[in-house]
């Protein structure tokens, strides 16, 4: 029984480590409705490392297509969790653009699609409003882009729950 309790507590502590707000807030002004998501790999070696070595081996997918596919999944899963929020996540370049952008900054990614990323919320002037770290477990089969997409969709779902917590609809 003690062993089960210890394992349960260990599981909770590890899962709480996988998601945390590092600084700032994720509360948006009351008039803001849209939140744009985009990649930002400038603070990491991610783009340089994976475009040259990994992405050419992704069964016909290339990095620009993989990025687009993955971010669409993140937006979809975020919006599922944002249902109780006044915020709608949108893709970069869509007609509906918000004054705030949430940048996905990949930190770690393995061949199974397990990932850890920093998510940075910035306003229209580029000022950092909030910073959080989320991890997502990748998939079990498919192309590397699909495995990566599974992991980022799970992280997007957690992120949607966080943004909902900060931006609940007023009654």
Name every feature range the model reports, one short phrase each.
Residues 1-24:
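Bacterial Sec-dependent N-terminal signal peptides
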Residues 6-10, 27, 94, 109:
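Generic marker of residues within folded, mature protein domains
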Residues 18-73, 165-171:
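A structural "domain/chain start" motif
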Residues 19-28, 127-171:
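C-terminal/domain-edge helix-coil "capping" segments
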Residues 39-41, 79, 105-110:
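Generic secondary-structure microfeatures
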Residues 65-93:
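Mid-chain, structured segments of secreted extracytoplasmic proteins
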Residues 85-142, 146:
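Surface-exposed short loop/turn segments
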């Amino acid at each position: 029984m003690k062993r089960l309790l210890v394992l349960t507590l260990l599981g909770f502590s590890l899962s709480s480590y996988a998601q945390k707000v590092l600084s700032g807030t994720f509360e948006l002004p009351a008039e803001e409705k849209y939140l744009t998501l985009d990649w930002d790999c400038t603070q990491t070696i991610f783009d340089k490392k994976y475009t040259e070595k990994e992405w050419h081996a992704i069964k016909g997918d290339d990095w620009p297509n993989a990025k687009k596919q993955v971010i669409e999944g993140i937006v979809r899963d975020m919006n599922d969790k944002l249902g109780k929020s006044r915020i709608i996540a949108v893709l970069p370049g869509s007609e509906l653009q918000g004054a705030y952008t949430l940048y996905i900054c990949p930190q770690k990614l393995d061949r199974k699609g397990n990932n850890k990323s920093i998510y940075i919320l910035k306003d229209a002037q580029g000022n950092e409003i909030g910073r959080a770290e989320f991890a997502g477990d990748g998939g079990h089969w498919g192309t590397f882009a699909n495995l990566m997409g599974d992991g980022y969709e799970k992280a997007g779902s957690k992120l949607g729950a966080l943004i909902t917590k900060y931006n609940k609809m007023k009654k």
